[in-house]
Amino acid sequence: MSAQKPGLHPRNRHHSRYDLATLCQVNPELRQFLTLTPAGEQSVDFANPLAVKALNKALLAHFYAVANWDIPDGFLCPPVPGRADYIHHLADLLAEASGTIQANASILDIGVGANCIYPLIGVHEYGWRFTGSETSSQALSSAQAIISANPGLNRAIRLRRQKESGAIFNGIIHKNEQYDATLCNPPFHDSATAARAGSERKRRNLGLNKDDALNFGGQQQELWCEGGEVAFIKKMIEESKGFAKQVMWFTSLVSRGENLPPLYRALTDVGAVKVVKKEMAQGQKQSRFIAWTFMNDEQRRRFVNRQR
């Protein structure tokens, strides 16, 4: 009997331990990265970025029908189960307006990344349509390559370059566009030094030395920004007021619980009508996202009906 991972959303496909035999059939290159734990169980060498990339390729192909997926060296290689959890909890949030999970919901992914992970999962699981924004032209090229390499995704996912320095929604949400929700995995460090320190902590936790290969990649825009996560989300909150009638729910991951109080104050300042916190857990890792709206219950119901 496979042990369940505590805390994952009930609809998450990754409750059981990875079936490595099946995943190696899906992506044979994964086999070379298998290791044995001290307990004699087969596992993946998570300290090796090539191993994590091979695992992601297998997971996305097996569970989400993404046959062709790759990212350039140096970009974040996201853990698929945790990313899927955000999508499933977001689906529950959207269902509150109509009583059913929305098909064909329109979602804006702020910082879609080279990996395009949230749109890939959301399209397969719920048939949603995505717009992905990104500041990095290299990340956009990578995401577009994934979309173009997998039949059907071009109709479901479109990408936009954020050309305005420091802007989040401005320049991305066009006049008369409407979105059921936005999502975001914001940069969490406030400097390159802090980002390096975070990588060092992960390195030590895995018992690695400085010369060991790392699964802690990430470009500057993925890992840090001035003021860190709180400043980034506060900017998002500030801009969201200008799109109060075009977006039903604004959401963002928040990496640390202690970052919530200043965000709640910012949401009060802009007049958010409702604020929700969704707690998530993947194994030992605790995470959460906050969601806010400028629409009351009746306005959200009308918004959903108008979108269909």
From Swiss-Prot:
Specifically methylates the adenine in position 1618 of 23S rRNA. The keyword Transferase applies. The gene is rlmF. Keywords: Cytoplasm, Methyltransferase, rRNA processing, S-adenosyl-L-methionine, Transferase. Its EC number is 2.1.1.181. Belongs to the methyltransferase superfamily. METTL16/RlmF family. It is an enzyme of class 2 (transferase). GO terms for biological process: rRNA base methylation. NCBIfam families: PRK11727.1. It comes from the Bacteria. It is found in: Cytoplasm. It comes from Escherichia coli O127:H6 (strain E2348/69 / EPEC). This is Ribosomal RNA large subunit methyltransferase F. It catalyses: adenosine(1618) in 23S rRNA + S-adenosyl-L-methionine = N(6)-methyladenosine(1618) in 23S rRNA + S-adenosyl-L-homocysteine + H(+). One of its GO terms (molecular function) is 23S rRNA (adenine(1618)-N(6))-methyltransferase activity. Its main location: cytoplasm. The keyword Chaperone does not apply. GO terms for cellular component: cytoplasm. The lineage of its organism: Bacteria, Pseudomonadati, Pseudomonadota, Gammaproteobacteria, Enterobacterales.
